[in-house]
Amino acid sequence: MPKRMQDLPEEYLTNQHALARAIGARVRLRRSELNLTQEHLRARMELEQVFISRTQYSRIENGDVLPNAAELIALRAILDVPFDWLLLGEKGEP
């Protein structure tokens, strides 16, 4: 297993970045539909026992990073969307 990001195959990095951007766009879209600010959503994540900085949350929405498992679970619950929509953008549209 590669120990550094630069040791990962280019295809993996390209797919990972594309997935991060797509998830971030869906999170932003659904947050806007619910009329929540980033800060409101972040505060609700804390109620779900997921503590995330303002910067980290912004990086998720901007597609700079993939959310971890706990963040995905909290986002799914708060945004009231199915995991398949959040991750893949298909089936069970919100």
Where does each model-flagged region fall?
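Short, basic-rich loop-to-helix N-cap that marks the start of a DNA-contacting helix
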Residues: 62-77, 93
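Short, basic amphipathic alpha-helical segments that act as recognition/interaction helices
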Residues: 81, 89-92
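Residue-level detection of the helix-turn-helix DNA-binding "recognition helix"
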Residues: 32, 46-47, 62-64, 91
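Short alpha-helical DNA-recognition segment
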Residues: 34-59
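Helix-turn-helix DNA-binding elements, focusing on the entry/boundary residues of the two helices
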Residues: 27, 38, 54, 69-72
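A short, Lys/Arg-rich alpha-helix, primarily the initiator
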Residues: 2-34
